[in-house]
């Protein structure tokens, strides 16, 4: 008997889950607003995806100015005691093209997407609820807060971020395939990255700052960890889907 998986969300994480299920011979349905995600700034794959041309690999140079402790304090203040990316990632490591992979996945799985709103309980549509409960497995890549229940705890940090969407543009005046992390007081930003021609510049968020540190910068909430019983029988994937730092 063929097993069936219901996948919630059609961003990169959702369509990667669909690709994995399809490779395993499962039938699948994808539920989401049928809108392709816009990928901003320097994002990339840390591993290739089987049976997809993901470009590369290209070697990323990852440099830290200052110490991991200084970097942790600059980005998170006293609110985070876990590791930071300069500790988690090798100084030089390979990267594959996320945008190229997502373009392929969208062309492959766009016809499988059921266009619908995914609303929190108890507002979820009866049709979607029934479809989920008839499935052998539910994979949720939508923000985990959608399923939050009273007493759940979601930890996060705010940052300012400025990401380009044009490979011919660029914000970071640095070589491609480089990431610079800065824990020193010399500059106000903490990370400048340029990968596959796309750049991201990030600053720590301070409540006292009245204006963005640069024109176009926006406030971004970055998940750290959560303690949640909501939708405990689902598999939660993606950084916002799992609400966990280090999950991409």
Regions found by a protein language model. Name each.
Residues 84-137, 141-142:
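Helical element adjacent to the flavin cofactor pocket in flavoenzyme catalytic cores
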Residues 5, 17-26:
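A short, Lys/Arg-enriched amphipathic alpha-helix followed by its capping loop at the start of a domain
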Residues 1-13:
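Beta1/beta-strand and adjacent pyrophosphate-binding region of the FAD-binding site
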Residues 10, 22-42:
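Glycine-rich FAD pyrophosphate-binding loop
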Residues 221-248:
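C-terminal catalytic lobe of FAD-dependent flavoproteins
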Residues 146, 186-221:
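Conserved FAD/dinucleotide-binding core of flavoprotein oxidoreductases
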Residues 39-40, 121-188, 196-198:
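Central helical "cap/lid" subdomain
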Residues 34-92:
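Dinucleotide-binding Rossmann-like beta1-alpha1 core, especially the glycine-rich loop
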